[in-house]
Amino acid sequence: MFVDECVVKLQAGDGGRGCISFRREKYEPWGGPNGGDGGRGGDVILLGDDDTNNLVDYKYQPHWNAERGEHGLGKDQHGKDGAHRVLKMPLGTVVIDEATGKPVAEVVEDGQQIVLCKGGNGGWGNTHFKTATTRAPKRANDGHPGERGTYRLVLKSIADVGLVGFPNAGKSSLTCLITRARPRTAAYPFTTLHPQIGIIDYPPDRHGRRRLRLADVPGLIEGASENRGLGHRFLRHIERCALLLVLIDMAGTDGRDPREDYKHLLRELELYDPALLKKPRLVAANKMDVEAAAANLSKFKRRHRTVDVLPLSCLTSEGIELLKKELLKRVTALRGREKVSPRARD
């Protein structure tokens, strides 16, 4: 199951209570105070994890607590600090405070740590309250409560390339060919029911390993901006992409017109977020192995003269390697070598 939005309730650990204790020894039955401090409560920490790809763990277990600190003991023994609660988050997770509706954190890097709820400090033992006039204080502090809160987690995947297209245009097949992802493929619409994040590997150069992240979102349909179909719900997963890859069925399957398909796709993207149309985009003309595709491609180019089009066939793999090279070249130019998914891992 894919979950990209859920609500969690988090509670950091309370601090331990300080101790009231006095030194009692054989030759000193009325020694001074020696009560230890309480331990600090554990924090709730979000950890960016590139191997985690959705929020399903938090959908069905929304309550997460860190350990409380242990109480102080006599002989100046401080209580043990509570263990932190570390929650692994997929990259691109936005944390929204349910009370205010405002974003409070964002997980963007593998290994990034965000302390969302801080544990409470431990209370002081009675040793701290000894003065020149109060030699035997019978006073200690309770621990401070840990922070708590209710948060909405919203996943906006981080990818270099966003793949969009109408259902049955061949997006899942293309994703299988150019990445290590293995989405379901079949000859019917909506085989992709949730976003797929795939890694496109390239031969290493003198700078080391090269790779891109590609986000394949469920197929759009006309009216997606009005929440028809599946694609609109998942369009937020391409908001951060450097490049949009628009896949068009150039064979005109089921009497469709590739030129109109492209027009409607752009319209749905604009209705969802006009900023998406400002992103650089590349059109991949699929199903060029079909006889009618060549004529349709000529008509498409005449209408959309300024659009960069790469013909290919997912069935014969024609044009696939050229597409991979073009994606790397364009994303590298847009983001710079250091920003091309440096943390994508096996």
Curated annotation (Swiss-Prot):
Tell me which residues make up the Obg domain. 1-158
Q: Any idea which GO molecular function terms this record carries?
A: GTP binding; GTPase activity; magnesium ion binding
InterPro entries in the cross-refs? G_OBG, GTP-bd, GTP-bd_Obg/CgtA, GTP1_OBG_dom, GTP1_OBG_dom_sf, OBG_GTPase, P-loop_NTPase
Q: Which GO terms describe its cellular component?
A: cytoplasm
Major localisation? cytoplasm
Q: Where in the cell is it found?
A: Cytoplasm
Binding site residues for Mg(2+):
172, 192
Annotated Gene3D superfamilies: GTP1/OBG domain, P-loop containing nucleotide triphosphate hydrolases
Keywords tagged on the record: Cytoplasm, GTP-binding, Hydrolase, Magnesium, Metal-binding, Nucleotide-binding
Name the GO terms of the biological process aspect: ribosome biogenesis
EC number(s) stated in the UniProt entry for this protein = 3.6.5.-
Residue positions binding GTP: 165-172, 190-194, 216-219, 286-289, 313-315
- Tell me the cofactors it needs: Mg(2+)
Any idea where the OBG-type G domain is? 159-332
What's the stated role of this polypeptide? An essential GTPase which binds GTP, GDP and possibly (p)ppGpp with moderate affinity, with high nucleotide exchange rates and a fairly low GTP hydrolysis rate. Plays a role in control of the cell cycle, stress response, ribosome biogenesis and in those bacteria that undergo differentiation, in morphogenesis control.
So what family is this one in? Answer: Belongs to the TRAFAC class OBG-HflX-like GTPase superfamily. OBG GTPase family.
Its quaternary structure?
Monomer.
Protein name, UniProt field = GTPase Obg
Q: Which organism is it from?
A: Opitutus terrae (strain DSM 11246 / JCM 15787 / PB90-1)
